[in-house]
């Protein structure tokens, strides 16, 4: 992997999202400005860490970061805007929520939302840029907790296990029980479960 070269600036925020692919729940984003004086060991892409490690790092990030913020776009916004535009909106909300304005923003992936400060995308940034890794951890821990809470209300769907992704089990239960108000109605499998598409 090519080492990432930082822009010449002090306050850099990393931004990442979790939850573009699931059929249910919000897309959750996070923005993080790390403190160079308080390094955090072991930051990596949230998907490559155990749940226990993610939870521990999440608390450490919240404690040590100069600023952090969460953003989100709800299922109805995803349905109205489409998942790409809803994700960009959620990223804008995360950056706007930082109590320190970053001088530069680094975003995981290949699409950059409109922001009031310079920004650039970093492909595989969640593995290359600690600020993005930190954002990915906050977003994933937050969304996973939301899915666990939803699982208590709707235990028949198994949200705590598959986190809303279209697994065979989720699709089977969607066909059996129909969609909840938290399902994304613009997504094909949900449309089919509602009889809105063949």
UniProtKB/Swiss-Prot annotation:
> Reaction catalysed?
Endonucleolytic cleavage to 5'-phosphomonoester
Domain RNase H type-2 residues, every copy: 10-198
**Where is the protein localized?**
Cytoplasm
Pfam families for the chain: RNase_HII (PF01351)
Please give the family membership noted in the entry.
Answer: Belongs to the RNase HII family.
Functional summary from the UniProt entry? Endonuclease that specifically degrades the RNA of RNA-DNA hybrids.
The protein's name in its UniProt record: Ribonuclease HII
In which organism is this protein found? Answer: Shigella boydii serotype 4 (strain Sb227)
**Which gene does this sequence derive from?**
rnhB
């Amino acid at each position: 992997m090519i080492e990432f070269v930082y822009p010449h600036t002090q306050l850099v925020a990393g931004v990442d999202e979790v939850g573009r692919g699931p059929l249910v729940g919000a897309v959750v984003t996070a923005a993080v400005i790390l403190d160079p004086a308080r390094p955090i060991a072991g930051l990596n892409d949230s998907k490559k860490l155990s749940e226990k490690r993610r939870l521990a790092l999440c608390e450490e990030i919240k404690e040590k970061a100069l600023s952090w913020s969460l953003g989100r776009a709800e299922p109805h916004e995803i349905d109205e805007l489409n998942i790409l535009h809803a994700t960009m909106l959620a990223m804008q909300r995360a950056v706007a929520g930082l109590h320190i304005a970053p001088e530069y923003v680094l975003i995981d992936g290949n699409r950059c939302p409109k922001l009031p400060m310079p920004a650039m995308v970093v492909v595989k940034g969640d593995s290359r840029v600690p600020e993005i890794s930190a954002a990915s951890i906050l977003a994933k821990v937050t969304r996973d907790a939301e899915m666990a809470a939803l699982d208590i209300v709707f235990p028949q769907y198994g949200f705590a296990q598959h986190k809303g992704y279209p697994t065979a089990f989720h699709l089977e239960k969607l066909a059996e029980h129909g969609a909840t108000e938290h399902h994304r109605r613009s997504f094909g499998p949900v449309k089919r479960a509602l009889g809105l598409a063949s």
